[in-house]
Amino acid sequence: MPIDNENYKSGVDLLLNKQNCESPNFKFYVEWIFKNLELHQSQNINDTAQYVFNQYVNSKTCLDKQKTFYDAIFKKLSSFTKLPVGAVLPEFEMKKINGDAYRFSDFKKEKVNIVMFYDPLCEHCKTEVPKITKEIEDLEKETNQKVGKLAVLNGNPSLWKDFVDKNNLKDWENVTYKDGDTKTQENLDAFANPKYYILDKEGKIILKTYGYSFVRSQLLQ
């Protein structure tokens, strides 16, 4: 069965039929659905994310009794509508780890590129970043192709260099926001840690999460 909006909506209806925010497994199912949708964003199934939210989450019951859950799903929904798959990551200005100015247009794009946002204090970042940098390094050796790699600090600059040194990021371009700049983070929808954009050679977003198998398949095409 092809992965498209109609098939996905039918599957969602089968799973969530007669359930609501007060049902025992409802939160687990909805979170699982959104995680799965994130992995398949390249299939252009953003309509399904909006459908799940409107049909099953956007209710007075959820808002009153599961406010934290409601807000979390609403935030996930925004990731499907802002900078969707197929959009070109916009131009931005930041600064390098040595303080020099940096423009995204300076980024040398390869066949496949990864833009990663992280905070050194984020527990998920501490485990995911070294794993990903190792996987990307291994993929480059296996396929004999370079991956464009840009790491954006979303946290305290005083922890920056140490995190780069310890997590195999020296081979990446390392940048962070200019002092006082909050607009760029908003424009890039980069408030989550870690957050990833996988881009093609033209800078178009082809995936909004990191997937080893996906990156490998793109390199081998």
Regions found by a protein language model. Name each.
Residues 103-133, 149-152:
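Short active-site neighborhood of thiol/selenol oxidoreductases, capturing the structured segment around
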Residues 1-102:
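Oxidative protein folding and maturation machinery
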Residues 88, 111, 191-193:
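Short, small/polar residue-rich loop motifs at catalytic or cofactor-binding pockets
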Residues 126-166, 181-184:
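Structural microenvironment flanking redox-active thiols in thiol-disulfide oxidoreductases
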Residues 169, 180-219:
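Thiol/disulfide oxidoreductase modules built on the thioredoxin-like
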Residues 102-103, 206:
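Generic structural signal for well-ordered beta-strand positions
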